[in-house]
Amino acid sequence: MAFVVPAAPPRTPHKFYQILYVQVLVAIVAGVLLGHFYPDLGSALKPLGDAFIKLVKMIIAPVIFLTVVTGIAGLTDMQKVGRVAGKAMIYFLSFSTLALIIGMIVANVVHPGSGLNIDPASLDAKAVQTYTSHAHDQSLVGFLMNIIPSTPISAFASGDILQVLFFAVLFGIALATVGERGKPVLDLLNPLLQVVFRLVAIVMKAAPLGAFGAMAFTIGKYGIGSIANLAMLVGTFYLTSGLFVFVVLGLVARYNGFSLLALLRYIKEELLLVLGTSSSEAALPTLMEKLERAGCKKSVVGLVVPTGYSFNLDGTNIYMTLAALFIAQATNIDLSLQDQILLLLVAMLSSKGAAGITGAGFITLAATLSVVPSVPVAGMALILGVDRFMSECRALTNFIGNAVATIVVAKWEGELDRDRLALALKGGGKALLPLEHEAAIHIPSKV
């Protein structure tokens, strides 16, 4: 017997200050300090964070398209695409619903809004008018219809993840079905994907600057002190999200044969980037590359990760039920079990109908409350000031949930190289090239 070990070029050790996650961490701390002591200057640095997010969004569509097309085109069994998508949706719906239920249970146990005694009539509904108007524009049917792009060009021009994914899946299937005639196209797309991933690496060099600007703006504009009045809600949300990640996702990871803590260490650069920018999209391209390096088949990564960004928003779901019950408790509205079940059912639907929108968490909450008559939509004004501080936690939880989901679905489908995963999670991931592009050496095993 023999096994194959990926060969990698020797790597020159980086000095600690050259490591990306160290640079991002320093940038976050510097942004907090600047925003706190010089709030006007901090607020003025918003363009740094915005520019970095735009740079990342510029390359998301090409990464998704090329990853999905080359992954699907390399399959010989087209039914496998349907199986992967079906298993991913089962996972997404199960854990998204569980996240909603956990948020509701914690809110009923902790009562973060009790004692505030807010009169609903005193709330300023105009403060959340922008979000509620966006919420009314969203519907489940409209969301599903919007997945189909008007043209392939419009999908790339708008940067809509699901539209690009939809076109990429169809293109990949078509390319696979033409057989040898499609090989020249595939031979062009594979090296092009490597060029795009190199572009990702170049863009990531600006990550510390983006994280610095985004964090300086957040602290400068809203101030750390703005958290104090609603500290119970913020603290409860962070603790609940931590419970979901380390207990629920930790058990899922353990059951499927890998360590959650090891996975978090493996994607630590991406986690710090998400923390600094409050955007899980900022780290989408590098997450896809790392999961492929860790042994997940390209076709699975290309389908599960982009879909999860719209259907597997665990952090957003926890936030929705927790925030809705907080508003009810703060305004002394007693929700019956029937009211809470209605809230849960509406949230299950609206979390899909408003997915993928900028500020999705707050807009989705508005969409939910506009349907549930018991909780005043104007109550969202209570949490408007601290929502920005909860967005980091939402983004981190969503991001970790999608990383775990991809590995689990790959394992279910038999498309996970466990040896590569073990090596990556032990710290050897950076020495691995993606499966389709690595050189290999043949080592005889002991008899």
From Swiss-Prot:
Pfam families: SDF (PF00375). Coiled coil: none annotated. One of its GO terms (cellular component) is plasma membrane. SUPFAM superfamilies: Proton glutamate symport protein. It comes from the Bacteria. It is found in: Cell inner membrane. It is a multi-pass membrane protein. GO terms for molecular function: fumarate transmembrane transporter activity; malate:proton symporter activity; succinate transmembrane transporter activity. Keywords: Cell inner membrane, Cell membrane, Membrane, Symport, Transmembrane, Transmembrane helix, Transport. One of its GO terms (biological process) is L-aspartate transmembrane transport. The chain crosses the membrane at residues 19-39, 55-75, 90-110, 155-175, 199-219, 232-252, 343-363, 366-386. HAMAP family: C4_dicarb_transport. Responsible for the transport of dicarboxylates such as succinate, fumarate, and malate from the periplasm across the membrane. NCBIfam families: PRK01663.1, PRK13027.1. Belongs to the dicarboxylate/amino acid:cation symporter (DAACS) (TC 2.A.23) family. This is C4-dicarboxylate transport protein. It comes from Rhodospirillum rubrum (strain ATCC 11170 / ATH 1.1.1 / DSM 467 / LMG 4362 / NCIMB 8255 / S1). The gene is dctA.
